[in-house]
Amino acid sequence: MAGRLQDEVERVIVGQRQVLREILTCVLAGGHCLLRGVPGLAKTLLIKTVAQAVDLKFSRIQFTPDLMPSDILGTEVIEEDQTTGRREIRFIPGPIFANIILADEINRTPPKTQSALLEAMQEFQVTIGGVRHALERPLFVLATENPIEQEGTHPLPEAQLDRFMLNVLIDYPSAEDERRILEATTAGVEPEVRKVATGADLENARALVRDLPAAANVIDYALRLARATRPADPAAPAFVRKSVKWGAGPRAGQALLLTAKASALLDGRTVPSLDDVRAVAAPVLRHRVLLTFQAEADGITPDQVVTELLRGN
């Protein structure tokens, strides 16, 4: 199923094979994914194409500065029965009531509205007027964001970032891929995306990923990596204690292990290895490592911290 999905998306998306693999890894692991990159790199198109290839309900939310939480979650309205004159409150679901949610340019809206997704992403429900409304399963939030240095952007709260299993960076295509993009997008025919997977397929794949066995050394390695990002941990190396303000929480270890299993499954293997954990370490940890002000001033990035951790482990 994952192979068919990848092949179908690549009929539309040129290049970005590693980015697509990381997104599929996240989907198979049952998590939410955040794509970060400058405008014009097909982040939105990539997510829309993945959604079109799956037979699930799709919803797009365009995050803007004036977006309100009710625009995402839904709202309650008072309706009057024309016959009896009786009034009652009716809940109108928002776009979050879908299976695949494209949260486009999520950091264009203030943190208050961004935080409206917290309960939905973690507990698969929303609370409106004190009433809980269950969301549809499966639920995948695939969000895009522009670099925070750009005008009109707001940093995502740490609690919001931690809800995303992976933070995937998308970069400029190679010269060869960009030439293929020019040829494909200036022609008269656009490829039609076929549905090659169902919601049941994704749920079965997710269950299979969780059922895959992991050796004790793989579990210990994922645990060690996550704990090594915390400056207060006795096992943290000196550069972490110097450069990191806050490290990754327990969700990071869970994400490392689940995405390592999903990565192994994508390669046709049923047992994850240490290399699988290393392969997903950067997208799992980069948004969970908060640097000190001095480290940022020195030009250090979370990816550099993760790279150093992998060298020492």
Which residues fall in each region the model found?
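P-loop (Walker A) phosphate-binding loop of NTP-binding proteins
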Residues: 38, 72, 144
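Canonical AAA+ ATPase core
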Residues: 79-84, 109-113, 121-211, 261-263
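Conserved beta-strand position immediately N-terminal to the Walker
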Residues: 33, 101, 139
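C-terminal engagement/docking regions of AAA+ P-loop ATPases
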Residues: 232-313
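Conserved alpha-helical scaffold flanking the Walker A/P-loop in AAA+ ATPase domains
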Residues: 22-25, 79-102
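Walker B catalytic acidic pair
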Residues: 37, 104-105, 116
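Pre-Walker A (pre-P-loop) alpha-helix and adjacent loop at the N terminus of AAA/AAA+ ATPase modules
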Residues: 1-41
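Walker A/P-loop
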Residues: 27-65
